UniProtKB/Swiss-Prot annotation:
The keratin products of mammalian epidermal derivatives such as wool and hair consist of microfibrils embedded in a rigid matrix of other proteins. The matrix proteins include the high-sulfur and high-tyrosine keratins, having molecular weights of 6-20 kDa, whereas the microfibrils contain the larger, low-sulfur keratins (40-56 kDa). The keyword S-adenosyl-L-methionine does not apply. Pfam families: Keratin_B2. This is Keratin, high-sulfur matrix protein, IIIA3A. InterPro entries: KAP, KRTAP_type_2-like. Wool. Transmembrane segments: none annotated. Keywords: Keratin. GO terms for cellular component: cytosol; keratin filament.
Length: 130
């Protein structure tokens, strides 16, 4: 019970079940098992958590990387560098340039990029877009 977000709390503070910290600044924002919506801080009580998620971004800076659930947008500083799979939310993109990584729909590109949907992003030296 009580707020479980902040530098002095861990994922265990909000009922456990969080596999890893969400963001460096918000270590235990969690998604309830029964809920499919993003939970914003402060989280007052979560009996069980699945995968950790970040509070919604004010701007779509990057996609939800790696194993996090769809619908979470995190600041670029929170994105792990070891990620290969990227799960996107609408109007979020991992980077402004193409990366050789697989993406899942729905995914949208920067405004300067073509709108045609693709499942694989490749890097081209002559173009900053996918």
């Amino acid at each position: 019970t009580g707020s479980c977000c902040g530098p002095t709390f861990s994922s265990l503070s909000c009922g456990g079940g969080c596999l890893q910290p969400c963001c460096y600044r918000d270590p235990c924002c969690c998604r309830p098992v029964s809920s499919t919506q993003t939970v914003s801080r402060p989280v007052t009580f979560v009996s069980r958590c699945t995968r950790p998620i970040c509070e919604p971004c004010r701007r779509p800076v990057c996609c939800d990387p790696c194993s996090l659930q769809e619908g979470c947008c995190r600041p670029i500083t929170c994105c792990p560098t070891s990620c290969q799979a990227v799960v996107c939310r609408p109007c979020c993109w991992a980077t402004t340039c193409c990366q050789p990584v697989s993406v899942q729909c729905p995914c949208c590109r920067p405004t300067s990029c073509p709108s045609a949907p693709r499942t694989t992003c490749r890097t081209f030296r002559t173009s900053p877009c996918c």
